[in-house]
Amino acid sequence: MSETALLVVDVQNDVMAESVNSDDVVAKISSLVDRAREQGVPVFWVQHSDPGMPRDSDAWQVVPQLVPAPGEPVVHKTWGDAFVETDLAERLQERDVKRIVLCGAQTDACIRSTFYGGIHRGYDMTL
């Protein structure tokens, strides 16, 4: 089993609609997801919700170019850091993950918060 996991954060319709070069970003993330799956690296998905992007709304959905495969964990968060008030750490521990390759949307917000949250919890983080 791989000690590395790919963590895909907030690549959702509403978030990507406001992103610069979103088509390029999604294509690069799609390539990472494909390579992770080919190499047996677990892929974890994170979706953010808040009053402006309610859970289960169209805005909240992962962009159609990126679809979590059956069995890939999806973590729902309401804070910038995907570790805060979620079961992400427990799910990673269940798979003995020690290294996280982090990608997604809003590098200045949720990616940065999750990056530091992972470091704080002892993970080897790659952005």
Describe each model-derived feature in a short phrase.
Residues 43, 125-127:
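Hydrophobic beta-strand scaffold residues
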Residues 75, 102, 118:
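Conserved, mostly hydrophobic/aromatic
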Residues 1-77, 89-90, 94, 98:
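Active-site acidic carboxylates
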Residues 14, 80, 106-108:
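Short glycine-rich anion-binding loops that position phosphate/pyrophosphate groups of nucleotides
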